[in-house]
């Protein structure tokens, strides 16, 4: 465990990905020193689990998020009344969907996808409800140099209509109120601060590769989907009440 001068303690979660953060109360305003340590841990470990938390008021949830940059509003999902930056998820045993049932990178269909996502759980099931994350830096590193050369410069197409259309209708979201964006992103992206390269495709939103036929792009994408979902790159975490996992799309 590493303890920073700000009082924040960082414990590595696994050799692959993630860290557990203690020594900070996100239900209160945090200092610049605390944020700097959190942000560095975010860069180092990609997924942070904040333990021993109280319920975070929406205003502070938003204030904390804004420390990372401009906040993203979901193009289709229901949001908290008065707080469009907060996406509310409600699911029960009879729900047609929960959320994030399949591997994905959050809203990669947007022209400027979010840096990451901050989650807080208010109600937990007695069993289940685990969340899994996969490390796209590690997945890239394990590719052969020749395959990296093939992928370098390719542009992936990300679409959302097949996902968002009708998805939230049972939660009172009208079809004429949603957006179904499409975007193109480099298949291999480089982090602007760390310089690390990551695979940026996912089974939910990525539908093709620019300049390739469906058959050509499918062969590459299906290989990458399976490769990125390999257990070697994964972690699984069961959240406690009010635990806040903050994943990077990596």
Describe the role of every protein-language-model region.
Residues 2-241:
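Fe(II)/2-oxoglutarate oxygenase catalytic core
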Residues 242-249:
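Conserved small/polar residues in nucleotide/adenosyl-binding loops
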């Amino acid at each position: 465990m590493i303890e920073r001068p700000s009082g924040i303690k960082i414990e590595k979660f696994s050799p692959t990905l993630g860290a557990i953060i203690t020594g900070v109360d996100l239900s209160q305003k945090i200092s610049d020193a605390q944020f700097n340590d959190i942000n560095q841990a975010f860069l180092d470990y990609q997924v942070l689990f904040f333990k021993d938390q109280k319920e975070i008021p929406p205003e502070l949830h938003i204030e904390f998020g804004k420390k990372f940059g401009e906040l993203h509003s979901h193009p289709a999902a229901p949001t908290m009344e008065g707080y469009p930056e907060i996406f509310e998820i409600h699911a029960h045993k009879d729900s047609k969907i929960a959320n994030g049932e399949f591997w994905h990178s959050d809203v990669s269909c947007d022209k400027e996808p979010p840096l990451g996502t901050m989650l807080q759980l208010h109600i937990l099931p007695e069993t289940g409800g685990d969340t899994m994350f996969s490390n796209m830096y590690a997945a890239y590193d394990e590719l052969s140099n020749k395959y990296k050369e093939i992928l370098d410069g390719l542009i992936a197409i990300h679409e959302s209509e097949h996902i968002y259309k009708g998805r939230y209708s049972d939660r009172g979201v009208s079809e004429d109120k949603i957006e179904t964006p499409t975007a193109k992103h480099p298949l291999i992206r480089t982090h602007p601060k760390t310089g690390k390269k990551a695979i940026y495709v996912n089974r939910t939103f990525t539908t093709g590769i620019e300049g390739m036929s469906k058959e050509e792009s499918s062969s590459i994408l299906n290989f990458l989907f399976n490769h990125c979902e390999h257990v070697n790159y994964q972690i699984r975490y069961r959240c406690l009440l009010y635990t806040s996992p903050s994943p990077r799309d990596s």
